[in-house]
Amino acid sequence: MKVKKGGGGAGTATESAPGPSGQSVAPIPQPPAESESGSESEPDAGPGPRPGPLQRKQPIGPEDVLGLQRITGDYLCSPEENIYKIDFVRFKIRDMDSGTVLFEIKKPPVSERLPINRRDLDPNAGRFVRYQFTPAFLRLRQVGATVEFTVGDKPVNNFRMIERHYFRNQLLKSFDFHFGFCIPSSKNTCEHIYDFPPLSEELISEMIRHPYETQSDSFYFVDDRLVMHNKADYSYSGTP
């Protein structure tokens, strides 16, 4: 597939599925966050994710998430809504200036995966990733992210990803990538180019000093309907 161009981003990782990272670790529970929209407030809540306005809206389309001004409080769709059985199996990120591969992660083939007891399986397992980067990552200007994914027995029309990055609920950058059409039962590979936004020295220092307060939502759409939602947070201190 073609190389696609986007806006900005960052990465190192701890996860159970492909994503921007240098190391792989178990998924980490997502902490509670603020409301999904800067324009609609939510009541105070106890422990756990807070419901937001978009969680009560179906279906959710691209324009809905493009209006979000802060990280979502919870996932906006269930794993069961991925009726196309889209499965990301490999992820690689490289510095476009030097060509250096910053990290690569790959799922083992289905035949090599350990059997699981579905009754004990967290329904959100694999949807959250924790990334650990060095401070130097914040000074990169452009990276290429190669993703390999498979689809099930349904055709995938107008496959699109919108990824929004925040620091302390301030929007840093929004990326919008179009994968296009994927034929049924296919394996697909493409590289997206992330142009990172310029960051002030003050903001870089704050992002380094406050690990995991940089967060992102990744929304995946088929025919303008949300079918997958992944989350991540980031540390740029170079340590877990």
Swiss-Prot record:
The lineage of its organism: Eukaryota, Metazoa, Chordata, Craniata, Vertebrata. It comes from Homo sapiens (Human). Tetradecanoate binds at Y131. Adopts an immunoglobulin-like beta-sandwich fold forming a hydrophobic cavity that captures N-terminally myristoylated target peptides. Phe residues within the hydrophobic beta sandwich are required for myristate binding. Involved in synaptic functions in photoreceptor cells, the signal transduction in immune cells as a Src family kinase activator, endosome recycling, the uptake of bacteria and endocytosis, protein trafficking in sensory neurons and as lipid-binding chaperone with specificity for a diverse subset of myristoylated proteins. Specifically binds the myristoyl moiety of a subset of N-terminally myristoylated proteins and is required for their localization. Binds myristoylated GNAT1 and is required for G-protein localization and trafficking in sensory neurons. GO terms for biological process: chemical synaptic transmission; endocytosis; lipoprotein transport; mitotic cytokinesis; negative regulation of caveolin-mediated endocytosis; negative regulation of clathrin-dependent endocytosis; nervous system development; phototransduction. This is Protein unc-119 homolog A. Belongs to the PDE6D/unc-119 family. It is found in: Cytoplasm, Cytoskeleton, Microtubule organizing center, Centrosome; Cytoplasm, Cytoskeleton, Spindle pole; Cytoplasm, Cytoskeleton, Spindle. Residues 1-59 are annotated as: Required for midbody localization.
